[in-house]
């Protein structure tokens, strides 16, 4: 009886572990993640895909160039050049996401502020970019200046609340950004 209980216990642990880690790298490099929980690892679709719904947290959420819609798109949500729509687009979300070509609409499209990169990177540039297009909100000077100017001081409808995500750390990208 003791052995069978131990076996059942070990099987349960194995299943729980496999189930927990199954979200890691969900979508891998270029796929899409749809549904409630796409977090961990490269999270919601890795490099290039899109994340829709629920919690798309974990690193690189939204991937490089993809889009993050709804819920919580966690670290790097929105990625480089993608869009971040609704909910909380977390660390870097709307930063590179809104900054380098994409848009950040609604919720908190934050990103950090780094003294070494005061204007162009990390979420605040996203707010600046939105200031040009859709009207940014309270980011750094870009977010306040351009967002306040063309966004009528309030971010122009869906400008959101900039500058409340993570901190820009160039080492994460392994290079010159």
Curated annotation (Swiss-Prot):
Coiled-coil ranges per UniProt: none
Q: In which residue ranges is the amino acid composition biased (Gly residues)?
A: 149-166
Region ranges (5 X approximate tandem repeats): 25-112
The protein's UniProt keywords, in alphabetical order, are: Repeat, Signal
Signal peptide interval = 1-18
- At the top level, the lineage of the source is Eukaryota
UniProt-annotated stretches for the region Disordered: 149-177
- Where the sequence repeats fall, as residue ranges, is 25-41, 42-59, 60-75, 76-91, 92-112
Name it.
Answer: Eggshell protein
